[in-house]
Amino acid sequence: MMHPVASSNPAFCGPGKPSCLNEDAMRAADQFDIYSSQQSKYSHTVNHKPMVCQRQDPLNETHLQTTSGRSIEIKDELKKKKNLNRSGKRGRPSGTTKSAGYRTSTGRPLGTTKAAGFKTSPGRPLGTTKAAGYKVSPGRPPGKKQQAFRCSSDA
């Protein structure tokens, strides 16, 4: 809510004084005239000279090739440095071959796929699980005794 403010300043405009609104309109028009006259004053003195441009593409292309070639070499060197002395649970140490016998993180020999049937270390027939009753070491189902060979001549 607006309250009327009393002031002795004649430039103060309150609500309902049309003379103040007219003064504002005149001031705004005067300001625009000043700007337009200044623009016309400067527009005559400014001269636009055509600039001569020289292309330096061959220099830039060779520079780009050398820097990009260096960055690729640096990236390769960083990868090699990161893999030094690497061993542990994540694969075989760097510098060893697949034939060295390191297994993948899933437990099957390297060079084999899941489709080959290696679900765990191959101590039981491929494609079987622990729930099938196979122990890891013997290679035969538990519960079956070794049958002695009987000769038919003993009977």
Curated annotation (Swiss-Prot):
Residue ranges with Polar residues bias: 1-10, 57-70, 94-107
Cross-link (Glycyl lysine isopeptide (Lys-Gly) (interchain with G-Cter in SUMO2)): K75
Keyword field contains Phosphoprotein: yes
Swiss-Prot/TrEMBL keywords: Isopeptide bond, Phosphoprotein, Ubl conjugation
Family the entry assigns: Belongs to the UPF0461 family.
Pfam families linked to this entry: DUF5568
Modified residue annotations for Phosphoserine: S37, S121
Annotated protein name in UniProt: UPF0461 protein C5orf24 homolog
Source species of the chain: Pongo abelii (Sumatran orangutan)
Region of interest: Disordered: 1-20, 40-155
PANTHER family: UPF0461 PROTEIN C5ORF24 (PTHR31894:SF0)
InterPro entries: DUF5568
Segments of skewed composition (Basic residues): 80-92
